[in-house]
Amino acid sequence: MANLIETGEYMNIRGKKLYVETHGNPKNKPVLYLHGGPGESCYDFSFHQAERLKGSLYVIMIDQRGVCRSEEITEDEAFGLNDLIEDCEELKKVLQIEKWSIIGHSFGGYVALLYASIYPSSIEKIIFEGPTFDFALTSRALLQKTGHLLKKYGKEEVAEESLAYSSSDASSEELLEAYIRLSAELEEKRMEIYNNKEDRTDESLYSDEEWEIFSNRSKIHFDRLKLEGACHTSLLSKIKDVQNLMLLIVGKHDVVTCEEQIKTFNKDARNGKYIVFEESGHSPHYEEADRFAETVIHFLK
């Protein structure tokens, strides 16, 4: 079911080259995929979902500003969270789309909710896949899981530190930095924080050297977002104001969308639906790819 050809093109969006893929008939209902990370790219989503979705939808996927295959952000230019929203809005105009739906994975779910709160009339429906709406809550949950995994692999000292952080009153910024530092201690086991099933994405479309360049760009993107700090604002209070139909998809084994965030969504979403993917961790789009595609098509039709 996979794409191993580069199907994207470069589009000039608000003074920057963005990598954009489109799949399916433009007459189909349009949906924009927003990747997580920050800085993850749409590569794995395209690899697993482009073929599955393109018969029913018009799927647009991007590497966000400064990420992976998109043009890098330079030191002397202004960049912040809001640029990600404005890029979406501009891309929509360039593609001559009046309204589109959004799939937001992980941090992409955060961006999607922010987008809907700023430009509600641009958006039809929203699918959140393992989203975060609150960086502090997500970092706490991730630190807790990291602590348990570190313990499992015999790293007692850092495990204790991780668990202590998760229940401390540290700021959202401090929690994120602690998580980045402590999860790195898991080394090659780090993806166990996220995956229930192994990620079978074939990355051979690009060379190791190319992936390294992409990864460096993405790091700048993430660092600049952290420096700006706007992403540390909780968006949980915005859920109640969204009129759009929303679907929350969470993998049973994922902690990114922690209980408190799920509870708030279920309580506050006016037009919200919640589905658990029993076999998935953080990425149902590849852990249960067929079910994910069917769910998306059914919800957006």
Listing of model-derived features with the role each one plays in the protein:
Residues 12, 16-72, 77:
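Conserved HGGG/HGGXW glycine-rich cap/lid loop of the alpha/beta-hydrolase fold
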Residues 98-142:
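Conserved hydrolase catalytic core segment
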Residues 126-171:
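Flexible "cap/lid" loop of the alpha/beta hydrolase fold
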Residues 242, 248-250:
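Short beta-strand/loop motif that positions the catalytic acidic residue
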Residues 255-261:
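Conserved alpha/beta-hydrolase "acid-adjacent" motif
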Residues 280-293:
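Catalytic histidine-centered segment of alpha/beta-hydrolase-like enzymes
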